[in-house]
Regions:
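Alpha/beta catalytic cores of nucleotide-metabolism and tRNA/nucleoside-modifying enzymes
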Residues: 1-15, 20, 25-26, 139, ...
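Conserved beta-strand positions in the central sheet of alpha/beta enzyme cores
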Residues: 39-40, 70-72, 98, 141, ...
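Glycine-rich, positively charged N-terminal anion/phosphate-binding segment
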Residues: 1-10, 19-95
Length: 341
């Protein structure tokens, strides 16, 4: 496949999806450690960059160990988007710029950003072309949904437009904007997009297991996949996927102790980055709720996570949870021991 993005050459890259409030620098690096091939920042307001807003600029921060990494921009003004993209390239030199044409959130759509541009192809075209021209030869990619709603599924047309604009690769989430994250992702439409264009197409939606990724890799012309919500509760899914694609064998989830080590490290680094431990740990509560999924005694854990305010709180909960799990394991083991005379 002829592409300006080298990670597609003779490979099937696994992307970490950009998720607002989730894929900050700390979490991206955790996922990279577990095997994510390509990272993308949380979406960044092009208007904020254009106006040199310092808070916006914080979202652009990444470390060299995260490469290859792209900065994702959203906006609807082609001139401002182009200038913002040039500023981003000058400031942080990402490996690519990514354009958000898929976000379903009301506050983004209300400003004609994100998935709103799926029903405004002239503006989408002007934005894509302006950014591609502004940062050339740096590659520009894009992420879309399959359409605005069930009556306007136009992903193939949008993909063809974006390819003509010079977009180097396209991630397609298999839901409409109206669906949000409900219902099932329509991989038939993702496949239609992949057949319609010559640029790499990355499939996204309902990839919660290595088996599902293997299934999608086998579909014609799908060049890679993007993992989103599954990584929020299990960043080690990247390691499991890589193992399964390489060997055809399923590897178990990490031991409970390793999962807790990852959570505590995430909290510790998040607190260091914020410089205010209590504020940082309180901000981590929603992330801890996601981590608790598929943990033993998950409901009880979630109740405890609602009140954490320090790293010591998290460490205490981990210690108690591991002790309880060990006791239960010993009890189960004793229950199945053979009777003795």
């Amino acid at each position: 496949m002829d592409t300006a993005l080298p990670w597609f050459k003779d490979a099937f890259p696994i992307y970490l999806a950009p998720m607002a409030g989730v894929t900050d620098k700390v979490f991206r690096q955790i996922c990279k450690g577990y095997g994510a091939d390509v990272l993308v920042t949380e979406f960044v307001s092009a208007e904020g960059v254009f106006r040199r807003n310092e808070r916006t600029r914080e979202y652009l921060d990444f470390d060299a160990c995260e490469r290859p990494i792209g900065v994702q921009l959203f906006g609807a003004d082609g001139t401002h988007m182009a200038e913002a993209a040039k500023q981003v390239v000058d400031w942080v030199a990402p490996d690519f710029i990514d354009l958000n044409f898929g976000c379903p959130v009301n506050k983004v759509v209300a400003k004609n950003g994100g998935s709103a541009l799926l029903k405004d192809c002239p503006t989408l075209t002007s934005v894509a072309k302006a950014v591609v021209d502004a940062v050339a030869p740096l590659p520009v990619t894009a992420k879309i949904r399959i359409g605005w709603d069930a009556d306007s599924v136009n992903a193939v047309r949008v993909a063809e437009i974006l390819e003509r604009c010079g977009i180097a690769a396209l991630a397609v989430h298999g839901r409409t904007r109206a669906q949000g994250y409900s219902g099932e992702a329509d991989w038939r439409v993702i496949g239609d997009v992949a057949q319609a264009v010559t640029i790499p197409v990355i499939g996204n939606g309902d990839l919660f297991s290595p088996q599902e990724v293997m299934r999608r890799r086998a579909e014609p012309k799908i060049a890679g996949v993007m993992i989103g919500r599954a990584a929020m509760s299990a960043p080690w899914i990247f390691r499991q996927i890589k193992h399964y694609l390489a060997t055809g064998e399923l590897s178990p989830a990490p031991e409970l102790s390793e999962r807790w080590d990852a959570i505590i490290e995430h909290c510790r680094r998040h607190a260091e980055n914020w410089g205010d431990e209590e504020q940082a740990i309180r901000a981590m509560r929603a992330r801890l709720m996601a981590y608790s999924k598929n943990f033993p005694e998950a409901k009880a854990l979630r109740k405890k996570f609602q009140h954490v305010a320090t790293l010591a709180d998290v460490e205490r909960i981990a210690e108690e949870h591991l002790a309880t799990a060990a006791t239960m394991s010993d009890f189960v083991g004793q229950a199945f021991l053979p009777a003795t005379a």
